Amino acid sequence: MFLVGSLVVLCGLLAQSTAQLAGLPLPLGQGLPLPLGQGLPLPLGQGLPLAVSPALPSNPTDLLAGNFANALSGGLLSGGLLGILENIPLLDVIKSGGGSSNGLVGGLLGKLTSSVPLLNNILDIKITDPRLLELGLVQSPDGHRLYATIPLSLKLQVNMPVVGSFLQLAVKLNITAEIVAMKDNQGRIHLVLGDCTHSPGSLQITLLNGVTPVQSSLDSLTGILTKVLPELIQGKVCPLINGILSGLDVTLVHNIAELLIHGIQFVIKV
């Protein structure tokens, strides 16, 4: 009987001690006891990992503008834009006036040939090193249209005996394409090309190398190129854009078109 009573007292003391110890912090550097074979105590100063809330998914519309710009850029490159620009017979176009009086630049170039003797002294003009730079994308204030800026750079190698050497000119030009959403008679949504033209004032022509020619000759050449190049390059880029829009991913087209139709802004700056 005495032994049973002693055991009861001992168990009570142990239970009380355990309860008191449960309220005390663990000694510094001592981790929670783990079952054998299930790991080591946590390193000094490292507590138990806190529960982390899953990251909220980003707004899907945030990705649309970037995906669309990438699709346009990739389409222009895969469509052979750079090769098309490099193979433009620029001198023939200039001297032929675009092929006819109703051609790309009308009868302007024919008049230039007769009025500017410099053209008759140019043996060749070649387009080299064409590049497509990073596209820009903005949305109209009313949210119903997109404007894609297609920045291009290239070099012109001009063979002019009157100068005595090759001239190399750097050219930069932006083409701006308006893109709108349309529904056909069957209710299907499409992205279509609106206005497509060179951006006014975006043409830059810079002399890169060689002996500086007589200023009047350089001014005359620059004046001719300023009248010819923008429309010529525009005529190569815009049809490609039109074809790219008709071949874009259906889901991408639908998502963008829905936002444009309802005037929802989704382009911040691309």
Swiss-Prot record:
Q: Which SUPFAM superfamilies match?
A: Bactericidal permeability-increasing protein, BPI
Q: Write down the glycosylated positions.
A: N174
Induction pattern: After bulbectomy or lesion of the olfactory bulb.
Tissue range of expression? Answer: Detected in adult nasal epithelium, heart, lung, spleen, testis and salivary gland, and in embryonic nasal epithelium, lung, salivary gland and thymus.
Q: Per the UniProt entry, what are the Gene Ontology biological process annotations, in alphabetical order? A: antibacterial humoral response; antimicrobial humoral immune response mediated by antimicrobial peptide; immune response in nasopharyngeal-associated lymphoid tissue; innate immune response; multicellular organismal-level water homeostasis; negative regulation of single-species biofilm formation in or on host organism; regulation of sodium ion transmembrane transport; surfactant homeostasis
PANTHER family in the record, alphabetically? BPI FOLD-CONTAINING FAMILY A MEMBER 1
The protein, known as = BPI fold-containing family A member 1
